């Protein structure tokens, strides 16, 4: 079984963007239940399908498979709407790679950073541009942003 261990944070400012290159992502959900999601993702000319289990702390079961690019567009049309669109940047800091997602569309204005860890107790030095931790807050799951987009939140994060 594949296990993903990651922590998620809000991002402040744009200092992280200075040396980062971004890739455009489109992703949708065939199932968006927080305890089990089935995600379809397009990254440039590649496609992926990912199955994720229930989160236990910062860990969850994850299985990801590459799918033909010809099928990813068809599968995205079958997904719950709207599709998530974002630019993902990779930023190295203190020996770890941080993935910073800058959302577009109905989630424009939301920027989050995720870092994958070897284990839940791994020490992590936080970059100055990292703000509040939101690892356990379901509303920040991409699968929930399709149902409750950031633009519709009554109170926006910092």
Features from the language model and the residues they span:
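Phosphate-end processing signature that detects enzymes handling 5′-triphosphorylated RNA
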Residues: 1-158
């Amino acid at each position: 079984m594949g296990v993903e261990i990651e922590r998620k944070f809000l991002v402040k400012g744009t200092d992280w963007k200075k040396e980062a290159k971004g890739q455009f992502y489109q992703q949708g959900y065939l199932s968006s239940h927080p305890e089990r999601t089935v995600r379809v993702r397009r990254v440039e000319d590649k496609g992926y399908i990912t199955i994720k289990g229930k989160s236990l702390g910062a860990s969850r079961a994850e299985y990801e498979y590459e799918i033909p690019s010809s099928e990813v567009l068809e599968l995205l049309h079958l997904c719950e709407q709207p599709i998530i669109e974002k630019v993902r940047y990779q930023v190295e800091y203190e020996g770890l790679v941080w993935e910073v997602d800058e959302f577009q569309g109905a989630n424009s204005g939301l920027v989050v950073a995720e870092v994958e860890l070897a284990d839940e107790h791994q020490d992590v030095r936080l970059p100055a541009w990292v703000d509040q931790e939101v690892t356990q807050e379901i509303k920040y799951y991409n699968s929930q942003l399709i149902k409750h987009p950031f633009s519709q939140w009554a109170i926006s994060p910092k």
